[in-house]
Amino acid sequence: MRDLIKRLKPTKFEEITALLALYRPGPLNSGMHDEFVDRKHGISPVTYPHELLEQVLEETYGVIVYQEQVMEAARVLAGFSLGQADILRRAMGKKKKEEMEEQREIFVQGCTKNNIKENNAEQIFDLINQFAEYGFNKSHSAAYALISYQTAFLKTYYPEHFMASVLSSELGNTDKIYALIQECNRMGIKVLKPNIISSNKRFIVNKDNEIEYGLGAIKGVADSFIKHVCEKRNILKFKDLWDFSKKIDIKLGGKKSLEALSQSGAFDSLSPSRSIAIASVQDMLKDGSNKNSISNLKSGDLFADFDETFDPYEKYKNIQDLTLSEQLEFEKKSLGYYLSGHPVAAIKNKVNRIRSHSISELTNDIKKSSLICLINSVRQIKDRKGKPLTFINFDDGTGI
């Protein structure tokens, strides 16, 4: 598609509409797209099967692209009503011999009444029939073209906000989010890790034009808990994990939400290390559900039961930081993919001596390649003939 649009160099909306109708297996295999491009740029002459069809096909340089053009051609040449033209369109689509012969006879008779020679009418019918096999509904193509134009505009001139919106539309789809994060990297857009202090449910753009990770994309975190945290955060500041656990209703999230948040790195801003945040989950649950803590909060004296010298992290001082491998595995568990890095990147020097390409470097013209990847999933099915098919999902940190 990118190659075709570069070759076409569309200068008006109608050409984007035609481009989408042409980029389908039938037109591509028939070479219609090449003929359209060549005629647009004057490489091939623009010709019409009959002079009466110039008004019908001028927009597409004499190439029959749409089903509506087939119907209009029948109306202009053979005097078909719109109802008759639609019957012709459907007959051409079904390719039933008896119906086609019947429609051919009606078409030729109509053309002769319009002073078009029978032999010429037969040739025109065959030509229309040939193109009708690939004709696409213009209204559908125009709708897709408008969306394509709008999204291309937004992606070009408002890339951060556009990508944040697209990411937010895929909150529950890990594979899509990972692919979109890769696209952000390619575009030079920085996507920050989850942060309980600044992240919202959806992906948003901050004042530095960076994308804040959406908490709703973390596996196992309840939407009601995210909403509650964001509401509390607007009126209360969180100083550390213990402060957080006392100012919010832990029960709304429970163990599952806290584990996912800590493993994804969302608590890094409130904890000395991610390993401590992960180890603190049970104590946060216990401390947050303490009724006395809630009463302290209501009375406005949050630390009434604590000595000012109390260090909540004292018991965790001997916990070692996570290794990169451990951190990545926790991210994989909570986010569905590796965010901070990738296991393949850790052995980059060895990998580069073995593989011929990274996934991001693969193109359709590469017939053979050696890759170093991690297999994410394997799915086996049987086709209609009962033959086994295997689908393997894998990635190397540059693509999936």
Predicted regions span which residues?
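Noncatalytic, beta-rich nucleic-acid-contacting surfaces in large DNA/RNA-processing enzymes
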Residues: 1-400
